[in-house]
Amino acid sequence: LQTKLFTDNSGKRYPDFYHAESKIVLDAKYKCLERATKVSDVERNDIHQVISYMHVLSSNIGGLLYPSKAESSTTLIQSTLKGYGGTMILFPIHIPVVDNWNDFIQQIKVTETRLINDLIPILRN
């Protein structure tokens, strides 16, 4: 989805995931965020990027997807924004480390299913 930040249609941006019905916007980061214990621990530019998406898309929920070493990491870190409000969430995604492509495909499907199962309750709210 191409998003434009300004009324003159300038400032093109591309969030990685946007669900229009539930107004949730997510961006994938290929960085180690596992040490974060709250959203504000994340690099400021990454937070500002998601807040910008949330504001322009009138979204109440925004988040960052990030790689995790833990196989079953489903701990979602959430923080509520001041001002217009909204919730930011950090979503850990297990990226399998395997010896061959077929094993990777099988294991990443499990990871994708976990992500979808974690997102469903949020999308329904």
Segments the model singles out, each with a brief description of its role:
Residues 1-125:
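Catalytic core segments in nucleotide and nucleic-acid processing enzymes
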